[in-house]
Amino acid sequence: MIASHAAVVASAELLTSLYGERHRLCPTPNPELSLVLSCDRAIDLIELEQLCDAVGWSRRPLRRVREALEHSLLRVGLWRHDPRLPKLVGFARCTGDGIVEATVWDVAVHPLYQGAGLGKQLMVYVLDQLRAMEVDRVSLFADPEVVKFYAAQGWELEPQQRRCAFWYSP
């Protein structure tokens, strides 16, 4: 069945009202699952804490997490879409001057959603947003066991290949 033009417009308007103008739908192998990336929707601190718990990160005081988010150049959420209550299942944030350089921190995808290419889609979205700001150089720090994930996406590893990788605007 083909959706009517009005239904498609209503759906697009709903997504924009929930996630903002810069949202992006993520392709998924499951047609019943809708995932949305956005840097416009506010990040709920409790949901972020639950995501961090799920990926095994230590807890930080929520006051400090809120301050870190407020001082970040870019905050990106990946939500499992539900018109009543979207659920945060992925996250990344960037710091920097927003002109020349940025650093990516705290990239996480909930374990139930890992292995489907969502981390890659999250990072592509982050880089697209930084490109739109005309940021030329991006660095990131990651745990040693995931640095190869970034290398496979074209990030240049630091010489020791331990924790840091770089991306340069073409």
Spans of model-derived segments:
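A conserved beta-strand-loop-helix scaffold within acyl/acetyltransferase catalytic domains
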Residues: 63-84, 88-108
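Short amphipathic alpha-helix that is part of the acyltransferase structural core
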Residues: 5, 9-63, 85, 161
